Amino acid sequence: MKAYRQDFAAIAFLVTEGKPARLTVADITKDSMRHAFAAYARDHEAASIRRCWSTWNMLCTFLYTGEQLAANPMQLVGRPKLAKPLPKALPRTAVEALLETVAEDQDSKHRTDWAERDLALMLTGLLAGLRAEELQRADVGDIRTTDDGAAVIHVKGKGGKERSVPIEAELLSVIEAYLDSRAIRFPGTGKRTTNTAASPLSQWPARSALFVGRDGERITRGTLQSRIKRAFKRAGPDAQPVPGALVHGLRHTYATELAGSDVSVYTLMKLLGHESMTTSQRYVSAAGAETRSAAARNPIYAMIPTGGEAPAN
């Protein structure tokens, strides 16, 4: 209430030229409100101006409803837009702590713990920038290998918009190790093949869900959120999630790491699947190189141990 009283008093002071006690309904006009808020804006931040505007808008709405004002003048008084906060990324120490935490589940006897899958989930978010719903919708057939041992993930994004995100051999190895562990957990659910040398990707139907839960079915949003949340909780103070962006924080980290590698806004827009270059501009303003080489620069690749196994402490 104190803030509302201050907002009322500040504008009343400006409208009455320093004599707020003399304010009458007749003083509340479009012009007086515009001039008062213009003066108020010179010494206050956008958030304060918007709160003050809301205070006076409620008052004028009340007076208009009570037929004491012919119209609400605040509808003709502009208010500033709040700048969107810059996306926050996880520091590298947090990423390392998360990966180490997932590794601790390697020898767990609990069926809910699945280190290979959780590592693949986390690294796909960190190294391919997939949203939570994109991780859920991903199929095994969406990953297509290249001649040099790397791969491309074909992502089904927002509004049916698709994009292709290149990934390096290190991440592909992590995903393949997860698929191998999945075949052990759920025998008979993949393709029947006698070729033991075949890629783990080829041993699953193309339309089979890439990430599954403990029941072998496509992973749910709840399971995805809970596994990431659990990793953050167990990683301790060195790994705090991005406020309000548990899984999305992995995507923010992907974008921020690439931005720090001098990737162009256009390239980042393609990799993230943004509709507008303005959204990508929030991450980077420098010019860069082509998509594949840009994605390959992500420093998180250096945190993946060789062989696709989860990192050890």
PLM regions and their residue ranges:
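Conserved catalytic core of the tyrosine transesterase superfamily
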Residues: 1-313
